[in-house]
């Protein structure tokens, strides 16, 4: 596909592991990315920032990094800033796009100001009177609701709440993961979709049909009964328009090159964007490899394409 001489990439670090709640997912992603790059002839090496100082990247002559870290400092702009400081090119978004992309609260604020549709929501701060806030939120948003920490990925600590009585406990659980908790109106009727973005590749939308209540951590990385529908079943014109909106939702946050934008459709077919992911999972359960495979792009070819985006000015 790319016709790129792998020697152009130089010495490449595959960053994976880290110290976030998503460490295990990152370890799986990183090992597969490493193998995919090596299969293509890239001089790629494993690098876990939880075990080695980042300064070793410069000391050991790395010129490029494939970021397979998920959550925490790997996705919130910190690693990106350090790599900028060391002059090492890296996959995915820069400091601003990464920081905003991991912060669901500020993502939604930007979307509200730029016309990207997103579900109505309220925020709860750690230390708030949870019972009082729960009563107020149910009155404003109704039920069911989704409760999620503002800055965790992979659906860590995301809970669906169907009754008012269950909301305070869900808020308390989410607040153990983040000082800001998002409470979002559940969009029902049309299903959940993701748009995978990888440079100029035209990847199909994926409709996600979990066997359980929603697409949680277990459905993403453990269960084998989640259905991923490609093609997604939408009319071609609607799919093209949703992909256009997804790219805009990604771009207005300052996100670049590669990632995902997740959204729900209501019963009338209206889209509501939930979040972006600037360092998507690359496990055998993950969505970008599935979307690429559907259009004839294998795993190794996909990771080389993503890495090739670091060659652009």
From Swiss-Prot:
SUPFAM superfamilies (UniProt xref): Glutathione synthetase ATP-binding domain-like, PreATP-grasp domain
Signal peptide residue numbers: none
Binding positions for ATP per the UniProt entry: 138-193
EC numbers, comma separated: 6.3.2.4
Positions of the ATP-grasp domain: 108-308
InterPro entries, sorted: ATP-grasp, ATP_grasp_subdomain_1, D-Ala_lig_Van_CS, D_ala_D_ala, Dala_Dala_lig_C, Dala_Dala_lig_N, PreATP-grasp_dom_sf
Binding-site residues for Mg(2+) 1, renumbered to this chain: 262, 275
Cofactor(s) the protein needs: Mg(2+); Mn(2+)
Catalysed transformations (reactions): 2 D-alanine + ATP = D-alanyl-D-alanine + ADP + phosphate + H(+)
Record protein name field: D-alanine--D-alanine ligase
Protein source organism: Burkholderia orbicola (strain MC0-3)
């Amino acid at each position: 596909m790319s016709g790129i001489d792998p020697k152009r990439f130089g010495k490449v670090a595959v960053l994976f592991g880290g110290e976030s709640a998503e460490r295990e997912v990152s370890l799986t992603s990183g090992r597969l990315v490493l193998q995919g790059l090596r299969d293509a002839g890239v001089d790629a090496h494993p690098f876990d920032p939880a075990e080695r100082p980042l300064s070793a990247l410069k000391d050991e002559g790395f010129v490029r990094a494939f970021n397979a870290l998920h959550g925490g400092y790997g996705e919130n702009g910190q690693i990106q800033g350090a790599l900028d400081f060391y002059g090492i090119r890296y996959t995915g978004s820069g400091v601003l796009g990464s920081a905003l992309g991991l912060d669901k609260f500020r993502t939604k604020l930007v979307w509200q100001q730029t016309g990207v549709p997103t579900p109505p929501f309220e925020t709860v701060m750690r230390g708030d009177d949870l019972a009082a806030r729960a009563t107020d939120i149910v009155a404003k948003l109704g039920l069911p609701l989704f409760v999620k920490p503002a800055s965790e990925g992979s659906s860590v600590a995301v809970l669906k709440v169907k009754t008012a009585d269950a909301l305070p406990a869900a808020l308390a659980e989410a607040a153990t993961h983040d000082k800001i908790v998002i409470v979002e109106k559940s969009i029902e009727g049309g299903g959940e979709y993701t748009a995978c973005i990888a440079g100029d590749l035209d990847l199909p939308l994926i409709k996600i049909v979990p066997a359980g209540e929603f697409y949680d951590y277990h459905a993403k990385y453990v269960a084998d009964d989640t259905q991923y529908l490609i093609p997604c079943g939408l009319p071609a014109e609607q799919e093209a328009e949703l992909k256009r909106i997804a790219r805009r939702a990604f771009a207005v946050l300052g996100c670049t090159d590669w990632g995902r934008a997740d959204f729900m459709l209501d019963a009338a077919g209206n889209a509501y964007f939930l979040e972006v992911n600037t360092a998507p999972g690359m496990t055998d359960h993950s969505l970008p490899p599935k979307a690429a495979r559907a259009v004839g792009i294998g795993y190794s070819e996909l990771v080389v394409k993503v890495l090739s985006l670091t060659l652009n000015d």
